[in-house]
Curated annotation (Swiss-Prot):
Name used for this protein in its record: NADH-ubiquinone oxidoreductase chain 4L
Family annotation (InterPro entries): NADH_UbQ_OxRdtase_chain4L/K, NUOK/Mnh_C1-like
Mode of membrane association: Multi-pass membrane protein
GO biological process: ATP synthesis coupled electron transport
Pfam family of the protein (one): Oxidored_q2
PANTHER family: NADH-UBIQUINONE OXIDOREDUCTASE CHAIN 4L, NADH-UBIQUINONE OXIDOREDUCTASE SUBUNIT ND4L
Family designation: Belongs to the complex I subunit 4L family.
Localization (cell): Mitochondrion inner membrane
Subunit structure: Core subunit of respiratory chain NADH dehydrogenase (Complex I) which is composed of 45 different subunits.
Disulfide pattern: none
GO molecular function terms noted in the UniProt entry: NADH dehydrogenase (ubiquinone) activity
Taxonomic lineage from the root: Eukaryota, Metazoa, Chordata, Craniata, Vertebrata
Function, as annotated: Core subunit of the mitochondrial membrane respiratory chain NADH dehydrogenase (Complex I) which catalyzes electron transfer from NADH through the respiratory chain, using ubiquinone as an electron acceptor. Part of the enzyme membrane arm which is embedded in the lipid bilayer and involved in proton translocation.
Its EC number(s): 7.1.1.2
Length: 98
């Protein structure tokens, strides 16, 4: 496996580890999710270019569209939670607390 693929997989694993470690803050979780989506985009683009899959050139663009939608929904949720509670703790999103 070339070193570029190893570095991209390591970036994905680092973002996944960041999501697991910093799961108490919504902003940190959103940044780690964006890092995961970016590494998946770069990895899928490199695989498609290396394997010469001409029919699947739209897959990375579709992945970017879903990443943009995820970022928009995440930022809207962050604004809503910070305006309601004043903090970005994920524990505030528990619906069982009344």
């Amino acid at each position: 496996m070339p070193s570029i693929f190893t570095n991209i997989i390591l970036a994905f694993a680092t973002a996944l580890l960041g999501t697991l470690v910093f799961r108490s803050h919504l902003m940190s979780s959103l940044l780690c999710l964006e890092g995961m989506m970016l590494s998946m985009f770069v990895l899928s683009t490199l695989i498609i270019l290396n394997m010469h899959f001409t029919m699947s050139f739209m897959m990375p663009i579709l992945l970017l569209v879903f990443a943009a939608c995820e970022a928009a929904v995440g930022l809207a949720l962050l604004v809503m939670v910070s305006n309601t509670y004043g903090l970005d703790y994920i524990q505030n999103l528990n619906l069982l607390q009344c």
